[in-house]
């Protein structure tokens, strides 16, 4: 099977150039030798969960704060300037048991070294039922939550949640609790999975109910994107620029800002 091989250092990596966020200093709250995620997406650049089982532990709050401060200090001394500090990496950041405290530390260090930098969290939304996670996400500049579709069968086929209790309708209701302080991120792609199932979610069957959900959530922005790196399943294809632009314009007609990454 074709396998992606990107596993990020932990707890700090980069800075890297992000298509969506600019010069990004990464914060990885997962082990440096594997992947820990509540989704097992067929398009994940880090590969499948079962093939990336870590032996190391997650970094502690103290380890994250120390590594982040050291890196920010060096960047300041070297004249480097990050646009954004981004929680991403090898899995779901909000699952860290000290996530809220780590966000508090990050805000403090950002304000000390680069007060103009934004703090972003890339999340699959599976822990937003926790009040502490929601409090933390309200403190960051870019609360970026995944919503690839509202179709449960498509989610089961492509995002593959680890929990059988995952309910996209409940996720949408929880997203509404941010009262607009949320950016919705959606992957659009084409092709087939390894079982030959069509994974094209660019048509109206998927886009129309997704737009209805966006109207409910009322996000400050929507980010749509497509495959840019290697994927663990061989038959996945990029959505075209024209298709993404057409979806972007439909979002904008709702009065919601939308960016597309090709």
What does each model-identified segment do?
Residues 2-20, 73, 190-262:
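Auxiliary Fe-S-binding modules of radical SAM enzymes
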Residues 21-66:
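Canonical Radical SAM [4Fe-4S] cluster-binding loop centered on the CxxxCxxC motif
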Residues 24-26, 84, 144, 183:
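Short hydrophobic-acidic sequence motifs that mark active-site Asp/Glu residues
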Residues 27, 66-74, 102-109, 211:
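Short, well-ordered amphipathic alpha-helices
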Residues 34, 92-93:
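Short strand->helix junction
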Residues 48-84, 98-101:
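Conserved alpha-helical substructure of the radical SAM core
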Residues 85-90:
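Short glycine-rich or small-residue beta-strand-to-loop segments that form or flank ligand, phosphate
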Residues 95-237:
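Conserved AdoMet/S-adenosylmethionine-binding subsite of the radical SAM
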């Amino acid at each position: 099977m074709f396998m992606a091989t990107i596993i990020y250092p932990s707890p700090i990596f980069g800075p890297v150039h992000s298509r969506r966020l600019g010069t990004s200093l990464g914060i990885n709250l997962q082990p440096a030798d594997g992947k820990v995620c509540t989704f097992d997406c067929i398009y994940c650049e880090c590969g499948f969960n079962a093939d990336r089982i870590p032996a190391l532990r997650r970094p502690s709050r103290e380890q994250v704060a120390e590594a982040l401060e050291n890196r920010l200090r060096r960047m300041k001394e070297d004249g480097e300037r990050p646009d954004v500090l981004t929680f991403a990496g090898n899995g779901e950041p909000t699952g860290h048991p000290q996530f809220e405290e780590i966000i508090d530390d990050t805000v403090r260090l950002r304000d000390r070294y680069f007060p103009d930098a934004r703090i972003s969290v890339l999340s699959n939304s599976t822990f937003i039922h926790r009040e502490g996670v929601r409090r933390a996400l309200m403190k960051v500049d870019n609360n970026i939550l995944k919503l690839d579709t509202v179709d449960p069968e498509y989610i089961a086929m492509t995002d593959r949640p680890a929990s059988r209790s995952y309910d996209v309708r409940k996720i949408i209701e929880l997203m509404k609790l941010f009262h607009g302080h949320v950016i919705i991120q959606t992957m659009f792609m084409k092709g087939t999975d390894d079982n030959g199932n069509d994974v094209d979610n660019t048509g109206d069957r998927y886009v129309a109910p997704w737009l209805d959900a966006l109207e409910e959530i009322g996000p400050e922005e929507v980010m749509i994107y497509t495959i840019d790196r290697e994927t663990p399943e061989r038959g996945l294809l990029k959505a075209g620029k024209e298709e993404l632009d057409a979806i972007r314009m439909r979002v904008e007609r709702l009065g919601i800002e939308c960016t597309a990454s090709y």
